[in-house]
Curated annotation (Swiss-Prot):
Protein name, as recorded: Large ribosomal subunit protein uL23
Taxon lineage: Bacteria, Bacillati, Actinomycetota, Actinomycetes, Mycobacteriales
SUPFAM superfamilies, per the entry: Ribosomal proteins S24e, L23 and L15e (SSF54189)
MF (Gene Ontology): rRNA binding; structural constituent of ribosome
Keywords associated with the record: Ribonucleoprotein, Ribosomal protein, RNA-binding, rRNA-binding
Pfam family, one: Ribosomal_L23
One GO location term (cellular component): ribosome
Keyword rRNA-binding (UniProt): yes
Length: 101
């Protein structure tokens, strides 16, 4: 991706899972991101979209699973996740529009 990409093209969606809810208490937020984006682009995108300061970004590339279907085998698409840590003392991100778990 180029450096002038729209931040909303980089951050696809928040990850909704038990683990991501637990990490939110430690100011760590998990997002699905575009597979070709790098950590610098992710950091800039989160800061622009949510108006917060990011301390660090960790990324995980997840391979798509091979799944069996009625007609043979298929493949789930590979995804990339980013765990974004905010600076200590910063305001929390209101991702889901309500109280967190």
């Amino acid at each position: 991706m180029s450096t002038v990409a729209d931040p909303r093209d980089i951050i696809i969606a928040p990850v909704v899972s038990e683990k991501s809810y637990g990490l939110m208490e430690q100011n760590v937020y998990t997002f699905l991101v575009h597979p070709s984006s790098n950590k610098t682009q992710i950091k800039i995108a989160v800061e622009q979209i949510f108006g917060v300061k990011v301390a660090s970004v960790n990324t995980v590339n997840r391979e798509g699973k091979r799944k069996r279907t009625r007609t043979g085998y298929g493949q789930r698409k590979a995804t990339k996740r980013a765990m974004v840590t905010l600076v200590a003392g910063s305001d929390p991100i209101d991702i889901f529009g309500g109280a967190t778990a």
